Amino acid sequence: LDIAYFGESPAFDALLAMLGESPAADFGPLPADTLAAASFTLAAPGDAENGELLAGLDMLAAPASFINDILPKLGGPSVVFMGEADGENELEIPVFGMALRMDDDTVASELNAMMDKTMLLANLATLQWETDPIRFNRGDYQGHGYRIAEIGAPLAQHTGWPEFKAMQVVYGRVGDYFFVCTGEHFFHQCIDAHRGEAPLRVRFDGPVHERATTPIMSIAMKPEGLADMMRTWRAVLGDEGLELDLSLDVPMIQTELGQNIELLDPFDAMTMQLWRGEDGLVVGRIQLTAPE
């Protein structure tokens, strides 16, 4: 399935402007239980039309500068991924992660400081919520040290959802990567994948679009696993809780995932790649694979 973006969406245009050239299919050491992943490279503000996100990261990096001190030490691409983990009441909860490849490993200390500051700011929110504070611990797995922010208890108290109790923010350096995950088990899988001890369950293998010039993002999914997770949460939240507006200021592009879960079932793999094509046009290719 080939796609092309001709719309005029400020939100989508701002997102696309922040994406630089990215290796076509480089996902790095993904956790074994990954259900979806996206690989991309952030463009420097001088090359992007909108540097607001990077300016916000600059604030978290102070007194260092994310744009001038940290970003130049990162190698592309960055990867975000999601999977699922055991939660309360035997309910599988979504877990998320991010991997930043480092060209200069001295940047790990600056990234740790950014995450520490982010968690400190998050802890201030618990004062307004009048909940337990976020508690901090350290962990070690296979010789890799990392930091843990126990965000689950205050989130569960604030929302009334005990399923959130298992949520954590776990972060640290693993080789040439800096990982951030919302679960310690997921972080351990990142370490296992980096050591080559866990199989990569999501693979990307898609043809290049004939109008492509610059690859900007690659996405890989396990549709069946995502469908199972959404069915579980539809039973908990109801259909309205899974409605997702994907319009991005383009009203013709809308869907309600809660009503269309079954569309994912026939496929065991889905990949998508986006490129900048002729005259800046964004083109893409989606490839769906059914079991043999």
Region locations from a protein language model:
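Signature of soluble extracytoplasmic/periplasmic domains of secreted precursors
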Residues: L1-E292
